[in-house]
Design a protein with these regions (language model features):
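C-terminal catalytic lobe of FAD-dependent flavoproteins
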Residues: 7-61, 66-159
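Short glycine-/small-residue-rich Rossmann-like dinucleotide-binding loops
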Residues: 1-3
Length: 159
């Protein structure tokens, strides 16, 4: 159920020792020709932003991290676009104008934590996953695309 896993369990009357914080990550596609990917330090922050060439003319720029209410639309806000572009422009000799933004998109990351724990800074929150078994129900909390196969293998071994 992805970001809705904890809600689904609650609405089903199943108690879990985990919950999920929802973090929106937004990205921009920009007209920018790069030969190599870049990792940029966000000035004054402990965050990084990446710039990955998509083809000879465009690059993927991201990402942001903002707590997200699942009742709200999952979109890249104007403020996030400005934030990402400003970080990129601090590292370019010639700033990229907003007219070079081709498109934007956003997604929600499910950040797992024990129900009684509090996470202050989402940038430092764990991207790990947790597996919880309740009778014949296997629930997966958190995780990342890069570890999805390994997580799937762990779940398959429980079946």
């Amino acid at each position: 159920a992805g970001p809705w896993a904890a809600t689904l369990l609650e609405e089903s009357g199943i108690n879990s020792k985990f919950t999920i914080d929802h973090v929106r990550g937004s990205h921009l596609i920009v007209n920018l020709s790069l030969k190599n990917a870049l990792v940029l330090q966000a000035p004054g922050e402990r965050r990084i932003v990446f710039v990955i060439p998509l083809d000879h003319e465009r690059a993927l720029l991201g990402t942001t991290e903002h707590t997200h209410d699942l009742a709200d639309p999952i979109v890249c806000t104007d403020a996030e676009s400005e934030y990402l572009l400003s970080i990129l422009n601090q590292h370019l000799s010639e700033p990229l104008p907003t007219s070079h933004i081709v498109s934007s998109f956003a997604g929600v990351r499910p950040i797992v934590r024990p129900r009684d724990a509090v996470i202050g800074d989402m940038s430092s929150a764990s991207r790990d996953s947790e597996i919880e078994v309740s009778d014949r129900l296997i629930s997966i909390f958190g995780g990342k695309w890069t570890s999805a196969r390994h997580l799937g293998e762990k779940v398959a071994s429980l079946v």
